Amino acid sequence: MRKLVAVCSLIILAQFAPAAAQAGPFGDDMAKCMVRATSPEDRAMVVQWIFAFIALHPDVRQLASISDEKRVALNKRMADLTMSLLTDHCAEETREAIKIEGMEVLKTSFGVLGRVAVQDLFANDAVKQGLSDFSRNLDEKKIKELVEAAK
């Protein structure tokens, strides 16, 4: 049980690391169920949870101020969502995936959910504008030359 709790605590963050394994068909079914079972609000909370813990890193800590109370509340909401997905909405898919593909399926399935949640975030107009602002600083000529040289 401790192993399951530890895995569940880190699984969403898995999308930021290189994938060590691909999910099989049962893991795919589990991931699809998890995405279907979450609302846009749930996925926004997942991104908030990820952000709250990334913001603890010394290299980015000065960019965001998240109170301990907010972090505790996000932990509770993420734990509630995790339990709901694993033991209620996607219980059958979770059982089968773990039985056939092992505990690693938790990492890959929650990684899919995390990626979908982040994609939702990037669909926001303000985020798109911020990315557009970034691209103004790129040297398009050099990029075109690089692409042409790669052909």
Where are these regions (language model features)?
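Positively charged n-region of N-terminal signal peptides that target proteins for export
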Residues: 1-4, 18
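Short, basic/polar N-terminal leader/transit segment immediately after the initiator methionine
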Residues: 3-6, 25-26
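Bacterial N-terminal signal peptides
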Residues: 6-16
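N-terminal secretory signal peptides
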Residues: 23-75
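Compact alpha-helical subdomains of small soluble proteins
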Residues: 54, 58-64, 68-151
